[in-house]
């Protein structure tokens, strides 16, 4: 008699090595389910995560009720501060004095409220809260403040009454995103920072970015922009990662409506817009942030040794506290509901999910992911966050910045995962840095490069990238600068002949092409890196004389046709458009199933891996990619066994228009040659001329 097959979580069925940890995976799922029930009492989680509609400052405008009676307008402010004994509004409206008319009253569960007549506050006025507790007091910015401004003279941050007319969306109708890209497309993400997007030595604005930079991104072909540093942060040089005010779009870049116009314009151009969401920690500042908000160190954060992050000089949220969950989950919904963001890149996920913050950990086996070092509360929070986000916007994009490789982060919640749509392939940029720095050209192994590009959990979508903002920061180097270094200043102009520059330009294109063409979900680049922007990023600070010289983007370099920057930009444009057109999410063919496991994009099928020649070839769908990493040898009539048929060159890194040598004639059609040994399998020999240090992409014709 046959025994009934044991039922496993889907993630375990896909990865049998997870069987010893199935109870831990099931426990995580059950904990998130129990917590959701505890929080909502059975209601919809996204309907519960609406703290921003209750807390903070709200203007209820005058109206006429159903009986024709005029109802006066009013202001209502609510705050959660359980340890407070008294709270007052201080600001321009009362000459910054402690005023009983502006005193909040306790209404239960640590919540305070004040209702004021409409004339009591005006648009543009600055204000703070004076919070008193037993044994002390302090000025605080409301935790749900939607606009926070720094005084140009005193440098002090205050909340600002903000009551501008409601923005009229052009591309937001009944949940539709105008011409926003199809969910069938792979993501091509352009990571950007508003403030440093100007060529001028200044802080750029939302409006200038929308007008000047957004068209550049759209023309390049990227279908998603990832905006850094949106949440308000006191220190510009933190790159937006020391957040103080989680519901306030940074005022140093402009107004809320100007940010909405930027997002609206991007949607109209067919692009998704996601933001860096920092829920992994918070700035320590008390006057600007949440630290000791009501006089206690543990209102939002852990108490004791777990309160301060050992490496980041910041505070760590207590994800096991219901009020903190309400705050953070409401924050997820707020940015979608109020600004029409399409999702988030969650910063610092590794730091969140391990009690050690991942510091000093090797993560060399599955035991690392399921031991006592895991913060179950953080995983529960991330699970609920993904659920809220996708309830509010089903086609939202969530990306985990996670370096340990924990299984299941980018796996559906119901199947045993945490629910992210993608995870960053953080090992790829580290690989490129190591290879460029430590490995001689003749030792670059084509098969090893291919392995590093495709070494991942195939059932979890990833975002691959050769470099992001991290690699461009002061003290580090971008790929182009590692390859070319100071020769960029003297030999990056047409007409110059320089081996270092020629080598660097060739490898820059090849590195980006193999990284982008082997993706399992998406590809990312940072603003300016696509054209080889020179130098590192260094925000204004005391050590550089508060200079903006290296906190900007020199667009004039790429706009000058005499520089190689324009050629690199042209290559990136052609590459992105080509890959977007062909790397569509689809079901695998029978042959693809035979060679690879996975389900997201056309499979990567390797056809050639010749270590001695430094040549590798692979296909995706109807595209064939051939890389010759050999810096010394070009190969004539190089034979590669591929599906028989006609092939046409659609991209060549060595083309003159991309600052190559243009050795090959790309107009020639290529036909496979008959081989009786392989003909029964439908394969033949493709004979190609492969210039040294180049890559070519061919399309198989019908």
Regions found by a protein language model. Give the residues of each.
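The feature marks proteins involved in alpha-glucan
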Residues: 1-74, 106-191, 196, 201, ...
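Carbohydrate-binding surface patches
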Residues: 57-59, 64, 69-83, 606-641, ...
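Beta-strand-rich binding/interaction modules
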Residues: 77-79, 85-100, 635-653
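Conserved, mostly hydrophobic/aromatic
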Residues: 79, 129, 192, 217, ...
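Short strand-edge motifs at loop-to-beta-strand transitions and within beta-strands
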Residues: 102, 110-114, 684-686
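C-terminal beta-strand-rich structural cap/linker in extracellular carbohydrate-active enzymes
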Residues: 123-125, 666-702
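Substrate-binding/active-site clefts of carbohydrate-active enzymes
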Residues: 149, 167, 172-189, 193-374, ...
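Conserved alpha/beta catalytic core and glycan-binding cleft of carbohydrate-active enzymes
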Residues: 340-342, 361-551, 580-639, 651-654, ...
